[in-house]
């Protein structure tokens, strides 16, 4: 491998700005801010808006969009009743 072309991979602390949840992970992203972690070491600090602690998919507070099909929209538009219900 060539030297000097690969980013430095290191441990960093990510903090979710909406919930103040912090976790330690590896990254090549750099930061001028640092934070002292639970193990006593100091790590670069990266702020994120959404993490697994605040994302609706992981928290179970997601909304399911109900998309009507083309046939349903046609029937609603022209006031037709469900063809399967009439049978």
Curated annotation (Swiss-Prot):
User: Which processes are annotated in GO (biological process)?
Assistant: translation
What Gene Ontology molecular-function terms does this entry list? structural constituent of ribosome
Entry superkingdom: Bacteria
InterPro entries per the UniProt record, alphabetical: Ribosomal_bL28/bL31-like_sf (IPR034704), Ribosomal_bL31 (IPR002150), Ribosomal_bL31_B (IPR027493), Ribosomal_bL31_sf (IPR042105)
Which Gene3D superfamilies does the entry link to? Ribosomal protein L31
- Which cysteines are cross-linked by disulfides? none
Record keywords, A-Z: Ribonucleoprotein, Ribosomal protein
GO cellular component: a single term? ribosome
Against NCBIfam families, the record matches this protein to: L31, PRK01678.1
Q: Which PANTHER family match?
A: 50S RIBOSOMAL PROTEIN L31, CHLOROPLASTIC (PTHR33280), LARGE RIBOSOMAL SUBUNIT PROTEIN BL31C (PTHR33280:SF1)
Family the UniProt entry places it in:
Belongs to the bacterial ribosomal protein bL31 family. Type B subfamily.
Q: What's the subunit arrangement here?
A: Part of the 50S ribosomal subunit.
Listed name of the protein: Large ribosomal subunit protein bL31B
What organism does the record attribute this protein to? Listeria welshimeri serovar 6b (strain ATCC 35897 / DSM 20650 / CCUG 15529 / CIP 8149 / NCTC 11857 / SLCC 5334 / V8)
């Amino acid at each position: 491998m060539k030297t000097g072309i690969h980013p430095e991979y290191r441990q960093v602390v990510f903090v979710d700005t909406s919930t103040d949840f912090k976790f330690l992970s590896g990254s090549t992203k750099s930061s001028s801010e640092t934070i002292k972690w639970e193990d006593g070491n100091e790590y670069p600090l990266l702020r994120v808006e959404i993490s697994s602690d605040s994302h609706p998919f992981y928290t179970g507070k997601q909304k399911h969009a109900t998309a009507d099909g083309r046939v349903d929209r046609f029937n609603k538009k022209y006031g037709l009743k469900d063809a399967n219900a009439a049978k």
